[in-house]
A protein has these predicted regions:
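A secondary-structure micro-motif
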Residues: 1-129
Length: 129
């Protein structure tokens, strides 16, 4: 369990239970999923948080001054050692900077078409079993 699940477009989630010919996968958009990511353009690090929608993850608690813009790509950072660095994750769609608030809220769309997946790969290179 814990292995990354990846499509041709990017990260899907991670294996939580493995069976002989199947697996239960925690999707990266699940409300309980937190994923260390970085902005490919700036290397700014953040945590992508699932919000329970297949088309969205959010970056929270980023300083209002953070250098992040719509169109920026997010990839795994390698922090936490659960996922290798550099796996494509999502594209920033909106950066919300509320006046007087110290933090920006960033909305990103997963690169993998999570609602339409037909084929995925499980990365066994980090399998500890």
């Amino acid at each position: 369990a814990g292995q990354p699940v990846i499509s041709a477009d990017g990260l899907v989630g991670q294996v939580v239970v493995a069976y002989p010919h199947a697996a239960d996968v925690l999707m990266m958009t699940d409300a309980t999923h937190h994923l260390p990511v970085q902005v490919t353009r700036t290397r700014e690090r953040a945590i992508a948080v699932g919000v329970g929608r297949m088309d969205r993850v959010e970056l929270r608690n980023l300083p209002d001054t953070v250098d992040i813009i719509p169109g920026d790509l997010l990839e795994t950072s390698g922090l936490g050692e659960r996922f290798q660095p550099g796996i494509p994750v999502a594209q920033v769609k909106e950066v919300i900077r509320a006046p007087g608030q110290p933090f920006a809220r960033v909305i990103a769309e997963p690169l993998a078409p999570l609602a339409r997946l037909s084929l995925v790969m499980v990365d066994l290179s980090e399998d500890e079993s």
